[in-house]
From Swiss-Prot:
Organism: Bacillus velezensis (strain DSM 23117 / BGSC 10A6 / LMG 26770 / FZB42) (Bacillus amyloliquefaciens subsp. plantarum)
GO terms of biological process kind: lipoate biosynthetic process; protein modification process
Protein name per UniProt: Octanoyltransferase LipM
UniProt site (Lowers pKa of active site Cys): K165
Active site annotation, chain numbering: C150 (acyl-thioester intermediate)
Gene Ontology molecular functions: lipoyl(octanoyl) transferase activity
Family: Belongs to the octanoyltransferase LipM family.
Pathway connected to this protein: Protein modification; protein lipoylation via endogenous pathway; protein N(6)-(lipoyl)lysine from octanoyl-[acyl-carrier-protein]
Keywords: Acyltransferase, Transferase
Catalysed reactions, semicolon-separated: octanoyl-[ACP] + L-lysyl-[protein] = N(6)-octanoyl-L-lysyl-[protein] + holo-[ACP] + H(+)
Residue ranges annotated for the BPL/LPL catalytic domain, each copy included: 33-248
Amino acid sequence: MEKETWRFIDSGNESPAFNMALDEALLYWHSQKKIPPVIRFYGWNPATLSVGYFQNIKKEINFDAVHKHGLGFVRRPTGGRGVLHDKELTYSVIVSEDHPEMPATVTEAYRVISEGILQGFRNLGLDANFAIPRTEKEKESLKNPRSSVCFDAPSWYELVVEGRKVAGSAQTRQKGVILQHGSILLDIDEDKLFDLFLYPSDRVRERMQRNFKNKAVAINALAPKRVTMDEARIAFKAGFEEGLNIHLEPYTLTSEELAFVNELAETKYASDEWNYKR
């Protein structure tokens, strides 16, 4: 069977506002049939705390710590919880809901898209699997997360290695298009991460941080030898091609497309109105 060709964009390290604006722009262009489906890789400059669309930042985020660590801050167009984007490869997938390979339900679409990430981990010699809830109680706990921290628990069809979460993803559907983006951790600074949230007491923070060590892990804590960012890019690009049975064709934005993204970044994702609205 002939492989479908998707676009591949590696946009490098960009500002938090630019990163979210480009994901939204790709979703919009795909909905207009201007571009085929897209896989995008990116990084962050500066390292950034992103929060989910629905998160209440006044109750959950410690902005003194965000500033102390020199981090950027942005609200995502997707749901989910707080993510520290630091030593990671971030990816996004943009594809129509009516694509013949895309299931109708959110969780099943997660599984299909995440096949690419699963293969990427395997390309790095890590035995990754999907975390599928086994009981009704586990299903319920996924619907009602107790923590503000995204990597605190594997959610439905998240990827785990040795029982610990290795990639966190969030999804939105707009204009008939699926946008899934997520983090693939190479390394993690747990103290910095846990500084960024508010807790009822120090004891609660200590307990959550202790539990976190048992639930989440970065690639370089597991890999037989250190994985560089370039090696991760190669492994996961090949992983998406294998997992989704596609061919990825590199693409560079035109000057007009870039201008559109920069304007969206400035007017929406860099604005206090968007970032601090709840």
